[in-house]
């Protein structure tokens, strides 16, 4: 599987600009690319307050429909984030968009402190089978909580994709976390961060990474814009679990209702008390 990490700067609240950059990346990707990954809330940027209501869109809104058309034209898939509105609530969401449609939606379950006054947390973890590989999504702060990636591993994830919006001075935290999450679950982890300046004096830390099931770094970006393709050797999944398998050896299961849907999605619901 060939995955392009698309580490870009963006504009907060400027969906048209961010969408234009996204479409250009799709149009110019290599012909054998399977998947492009963009940063957290890349389409909308980071917004809050009254501005959030102006830029947030429903799951099947016009921006994602435009994105879907581009995905179909190139026969690739895309993972990226946006500010979602649903039934009057706002969510920090990421989606896996394939030529067949929106294959997977994930709402950030662990909100950063400054987000909690604007966004509602998601209530489930989800994986889906895509091109023979089971994929799960996480968003930024999620990866600092080991239970999030373990939930996806419990749902059979082989590749965890993280849309990231990590800023200074926390870059080293996510560098450590993404390697740990890959190694302790014996799966691939791909994290794509934003770069450049944001609103309110934020400076995004870059450092997008791809890590193999042994916790070894396959690629690590710097602090500038970059597009880089990594090819995942899926045989490494079996190799990492040959001598010991953490999921089989563990004695503690994560709680929550687990469901498998006819379309292949697997979900683990977070209990009301959690």
Curated annotation (Swiss-Prot):
<keyword id="KW-0378">Hydrolase</keyword>
<dbReference type="InterPro" id="IPR003010">
    <property type="entry name" value="C-N_Hydrolase"/>
</dbReference>
<dbReference type="InterPro" id="IPR036526">
    <property type="entry name" value="C-N_Hydrolase_sf"/>
</dbReference>
<comment type="subunit">
    <text>Monomer.</text>
</comment>
<feature type="active site" description="Proton acceptor">
    <location>
        <position position="40"/>
    </location>
</feature>
<feature type="domain" description="CN hydrolase">
    <location>
        <begin position="1"/>
        <end position="234"/>
    </location>
</feature>
<comment type="function">
    <text>Hydrolyzes (R)-piperazine-2-carboxamide and (R)-piperazine-2-tert-butylcarboxamide with strict R-stereoselectivity. Also active towards beta-alaninamide, piperidine-3-carboxmide, D-glutaminamide and slightly active towards L-glutaminamide and piperidine-4-carboxamide.</text>
</comment>
<feature type="active site" description="Proton donor">
    <location>
        <position position="108"/>
    </location>
</feature>
<protein>
    <recommendedName>
        <fullName>(R)-stereoselective amidase</fullName>
        <ecNumber>3.5.1.100</ecNumber>
    </recommendedName>
</protein>
<feature type="active site" description="Nucleophile">
    <location>
        <position position="140"/>
    </location>
</feature>
<dbReference type="InterPro" id="IPR044083">
    <property type="entry name" value="RamA-like"/>
</dbReference>
<dbReference type="GO" id="GO:0016787">
    <property type="term" value="F:hydrolase activity"/>
</dbReference>
<dbReference type="Pfam" id="PF00795">
    <property type="entry name" value="CN_hydrolase"/>
</dbReference>
């Amino acid at each position: 599987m060939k995955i392009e990490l698309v580490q870009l700067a963006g504009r907060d609240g400027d969906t048209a600009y961010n969408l234009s950059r996204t479409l250009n990346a799709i149009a110019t990707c290599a012909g054998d690319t399977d998947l492009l990954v963009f940063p957290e809330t890349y389409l909308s940027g980071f917004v809050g307050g009254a501005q959030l209501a102006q830029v947030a869109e429903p799951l099947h809104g016009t921006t994602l429909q435009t994105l879907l058309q581009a995905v179909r034209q190139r026969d690739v898939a895309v993972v990226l984030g946006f500010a979602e509105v649903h039934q009057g609530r706002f969510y920090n969401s990421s989606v896996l968009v394939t030529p067949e449609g929106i294959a997977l939606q994930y709402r950030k379950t662990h909100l950063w402190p400054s987000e909690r006054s604007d966004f509602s947390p998601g209530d489930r973890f989800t994986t889906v089978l895509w091109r023979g590989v089971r994929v799960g999504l996480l968003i930024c702060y999620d990866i600092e909580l080991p239970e999030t990636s373990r939930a996806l591993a419990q749902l059979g994830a082989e590749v965890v994709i993280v849309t990231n919006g990590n800023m200074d001075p926390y870059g080293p935290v996510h560098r450590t976390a993404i390697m740990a999450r890959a190694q302790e679950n014996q799966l691939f982890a791909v994290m794509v961060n934003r770069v450049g300046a944001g609103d309110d004096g934020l400076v995004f830390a870059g450092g997008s990474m791809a890590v193999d099931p042994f916790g070894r770094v396959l690629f690590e970006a710097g602090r500038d814009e970059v597009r880089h393709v990594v090819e995942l050797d899926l045989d490494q999944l079996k190799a990492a679990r040959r001598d010991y398998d953490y999921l089989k050896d563990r004695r503690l299961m994560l709680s929550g209702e687990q469901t498998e849907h006819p379309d292949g999605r697997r979900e683990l619901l977070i209990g009301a008390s959690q």
